[in-house]
From Swiss-Prot:
Encoding gene per record: Tmem229a
Topology relative to the membrane: Multi-pass membrane protein
Lineage per the UniProt record: Eukaryota, Metazoa, Chordata, Craniata, Vertebrata
Designated name of the protein: Transmembrane protein 229A
Start and end residues of each stretch annotated as Disordered: 1-30
Entry keyword Transmembrane: yes
Species, as recorded: Mus musculus
Length: 371
């Protein structure tokens, strides 16, 4: 249930209004007409490009961890019928997923050069995917000596190869095809300011473009962002980020807190829905408290933390009644019914602040479908 607040700049006003000598009123009306509503990415394609490489690597690592958790959770449930739906991955695998996904992306972008789309989609790309994943898995096992909890799969058999082939088809035909439609604005703020008319005409243009102000403008007068990813995609992002948070936390807690030489962290399939829904609501709180009320970071964070604890307790209580709760803090001090503990308060504070940063970034990302 992550949350981060960084003062960031919203989109800059468009410079579509041209100056007419001696026609201040005409300039005002022309500027207002040119900036009626926030532009979508489809309406302003020149201002947006592909996601930066660092952002794609971040997404790829998070997406890879999600697949690890889904596969290991399904395997474990098939063996034990455990309703906790525990899944496993590790920071090492996150790094490998980032690198292998990035390499596969470069191969995917060469698809137009292949004379046969069928050959590329069902043979060439899946073969590269299976080969890279197998090589990465073998390298991880050799470096760590194998991992507990199913983080590192055994040697590939026929069923494993079939699963990897299906994942390769999903990766090429579903994930990358849509992920590469995401767009991010290029930084033109400084260039735009340098080319705006000076004095009163520039002020008029800034006022006319004020409807597009987003994070970073005057507090209390800003509009809540209306751009960004659709709500469903935001929910999916927050759910996957919840997996990332828990895998990293449990991994480092096992290694540092207990002195255990663990090579994996764990989470639960239910955490996807718990984190996704909680972060989705916290983001709405951020937009309301920051843009409508003008509240600063440390005035908002206590509200976030109270909501997070209430959300964790409610989910834990419901899952415990079904025998599906994957955590128990009864052995920790400052716990309540073993479902929440103040020991994790520093972590929730950090994640609460971090989510505002994530929200500011997601507000700039646009999904632009291609024909």
């Amino acid at each position: 249930m992550a949350g981060s607040d960084v003062a960031s700049e919203g989109p800059s006003p468009r410079d579509g209004a041209t100056r007419r000598p001696g026609a201040t009123g005409g300039l005002r009306s022309q500027a207002a007409a040119s900036c009626p509503e926030p532009l979508s990415a489809a309406e302003a394609p020149a201002e947006r490009g592909a996601l930066p490489a660092w952002m794609r690597l971040y997404f790829y690592g998070m997406h890879g961890i999600t697949l690890d958790v889904l596969v290991s959770s399904a395997r474990r449930f098939a063996r034990s019928l455990d309703l906790r739906m525990l899944g496993f991955s590790s920071p090492y695998r996150c790094l490998l997923h980032s690198l292998t996904h990035f390499a596969l992306e470069q191969l995917y972008l060469q698809r137009p050069r292949c004379p046969s789309a069928f050959l590329f989609n069902f043979l060439l790309y899946p073969s590269a995917h299976v080969g890279l994943q197998t090589l990465a898995g073998q390298a991880l096992r050799l470096s760590l000596g194998g991992g507990p909890g199913g983080a590192a799969a055994p040697a590939l058999g026929a069923l494993d190869l079939a699963l990897q082939y299906v994942l390769a088809l999903y990766h090429g035909q579903v994930f990358l095809k849509r992920f590469l439609c995401l767009r991010y604005p290029r930084r033109r703020d400084q260039h735009t300011r340098d080319t705006l008319p000076a004095a009163r005409d520039a002020q008029i243009l800034w006022e006319a473009g004020g409807q597009r102000r987003g994070p970073g403008g005057a507090r209390g007068t800003e509009r809540s962002p209306t751009q960004g990813l659709p709500d469903l995609l935001r929910f999916l992002f927050f759910g996957m980020h919840g997996f990332l948070d828990e895998i990293f936390f449990t991994f480092f807690f096992n290694v540092l807190g207990q002195g255990d030489r663990a090579s994996s962290g764990h989470t639960s399939l239910w955490s996807f829905f718990m984190y996704g829904s909680c972060s989705f609501v916290v983001e709405k709180l951020y937009f309301h408290l920051h843009y409508s009320r003008g509240w600063g970071t440390w005035k908002r964070v206590p509200i976030y933390v109270i909501f997070i604890y209430a959300w964790e307790f409610s989910w834990g209580l419901g899952l415990r009644m079904c025998g599906a709760c994957s955590w128990d803090y009864s052995h920790y001090p400052l716990n309540f019914m073993g479902l929440i503990t103040l020991m994790y308060l520093p972590g929730w504070l950090f994640l609460s602040v971090y989510q505002d940063l994530l929200s500011n970034v997601l507000w700039r990302v646009q999904y632009v479908p291609t024909n």
